[in-house]
A protein has these predicted regions:
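Non-catalytic, solvent-exposed segments at the cell envelope interface
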Residues: 2-43, 52-100, 104-464
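Glycine- and charge-rich intrinsically disordered segments
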Residues: 49
Length: 464
């Protein structure tokens, strides 16, 4: 069936662009002339019959001559009319302000209460121990480095140390901690608890005397009325290490403290078994009882050197504890301070110093946290033997090796000190020719052992 001739739209031919009719929006835009009032921008123009485009003088299509203002256009100098705005209720800003103040007040009150609670727990008693200025860091280096003596007070079952319960216990864990704030490092020195200090009476370089009932360093505080300052002065005199603050930890409270943390993840380098307690090698979550066994054990397989091997094992606990604290963050740790300092820890540090230490600690990379121990000559038996007592088994400090260790790692702010300048008793007691190793390690190395155990699947931690 034939069709009529198709009409060709010549406007679309020869690649000529199609003429588009202005939409309402574009038409409205065209009539928004300068100087006209705003209300015209909201007024819909009346429908208009489309007009053919006018020819410009040059014969081209388009031009500005065809634009006409709306029928109701106002004079150019007509007054501008503003939109009416909804009035904000008078009470609304006041309510918002009060709400914000209430929130801020609540936060401030909570923070102040927490700080006051911590400060109350940290306030020393009237007769609290204080360290003499002579053993502290030189004034010119204060703020760059802080040196802290950390001692674990152990209460061995069945032994009555004194009639005053607050003075019971030996300092079986002695840890010298140097916070190098300026250098971004933490260096820790373990001193074996049975290190010989001299006879039962210790005479310091300045003429002061202190007692040591068992000849060993762990009895100094107890032998002098539980005064931790006495131990600090002995360490300063014999090792020439400045001490600014002390921290004592109740080792019997370790169980509760670890349980309050929800356990501590620790890498155990070898199987442990003694007196019915067993821990298997691997990355384990230790509860309080297991942690106590881990840090106190010094017998059984892997403990040929008894106390020295125990010091090496305790490093893995420190590494696990450090990792846990760093993962908690400063805010969560501060929230734990009232419980910790009220029940487990005593110190002469104020809250500002503790907060500064926490912030500094969280910024220290594990590769800059170092552990070492003082080299000693092993096996000096029967010290103080009597007809009814076999005596004590002690170790003799190796002054030469200790001087080298301390000059390498711990005397950045004091300068080197020779073995002769220290007041150690190396030459006062018989000993062998070979001493133990300083066993310098960094926590980053210990963390890697934990990571390797996790990667190999040797862990009881779900998702580790």
């Amino acid at each position: 069936m034939s069709q009529g001739p198709r009409h060709i739209n010549t406007d679309r031919s020869l690649n000529r662009p199609t003429e588009q009719r202005p939409t309402e929006a574009s038409a409205l835009h065209q009539v928004s002339l300068s100087g006209q009032p705003d209300f015209f921008q909201n007024e819909q123009p009346a429908p208009q019959r489309p007009e053919p485009p006018r020819q410009s003088a040059g014969g081209g299509r388009g031009g500005n001559g065809g634009s006409q203002p709306p029928r109701h256009a106002a004079p150019a100098d007509a007054p501008r009319r503003r939109k009416k705005k909804k009035k904000t209720p008078v009470w609304l800003p006041m309510a918002v302000t009060l709400a914000v103040l209430a929130v801020i007040s609540g936060v401030v009150v909570y923070a102040v209460n927490m700080v006051n609670k911590v400060e109350d727990n940290l306030k020393p008693e009237e007769n609290a121990t204080s360290l003499v200025e002579e053993i502290q860091t030189l004034e010119e280096y204060k703020g760059d480095v802080v040196n802290i003596l950390v001692c674990g007070i152990d209460y061995e079952e069945g032994l009555a140390y004194s009639s005053d319960g607050s003075n019971d216990g030996m300092t079986d864990m002695i840890l010298y901690c140097q916070f190098d704030i300026k250098g971004g490092a933490l260096r820790m020195l373990q001193i074996p608890r049975n290190t010989l200090v001299t006879n039962r009476k210790i005479t310091l370089s300045n003429g002061k005397t202190y007692a040591a009932t068992n000849y060993q360093i762990n009895s100094v505080a107890l032998s002098n009325g539980g005064d931790i300052a006495a131990l600090a002065e002995v360490i300063y005199d014999q090792y020439k290490l400045p001490i600014d603050y002390y921290v004592t930890i109740d080792m019997q409270a370790l169980v509760e403290m670890v349980d309050n943390f929800g356990g501590i993840e620790v890498y155990i380098p070898h199987d442990m078994s003694f007196a019915g307690s067993v821990l298997k090698q691997g990355y384990r979550n230790l509860d309080g009882a297991s942690a106590e066994f881990f840090v106190r054990c010094r017998h059984g397989e892997g403990y040929a050197n008894s106390d020295i091997d125990r010091l090496n094992m305790q490093r893995y606990f420190y590494a696990g504890l450090f990792k846990r604290v760093r993962s908690m963050g400063v805010t969560d740790v501060i929230a734990q301070l009232p419980l910790i300092f009220n029940n487990y820890i005593h110190t002469d540090m104020d809250l500002t110093t503790i907060a500064k230490m926490l912030v500094s600690f969280t910024r220290i990379d594990s590769g800059n946290i170092m552990l070492a121990q003082t080299p000693v000559f092993m096996g000096v038996p029967n010290v103080g033997k009597t007809s009814s007592f076999d005596g004590y088994s002690c170790v003799v400090p190796d002054a030469g090796s200790i001087a080298e260790l301390l000059n390498t790692y711990f005397r950045n702010y004091t300068g080197p000190v020779s073995a002769e300048e220290m007041n150690l008793v190396t030459n006062n007691w018989p000993h062998g020719t070979a001493s133990t190793s300083a066993n310098v390690q960094f926590v980053g190395q210990l963390d890697k052992e934990s990571d390797d155990a996790i990667l190999s699947g040797d862990t009881d931690e779900a998702g580790a």
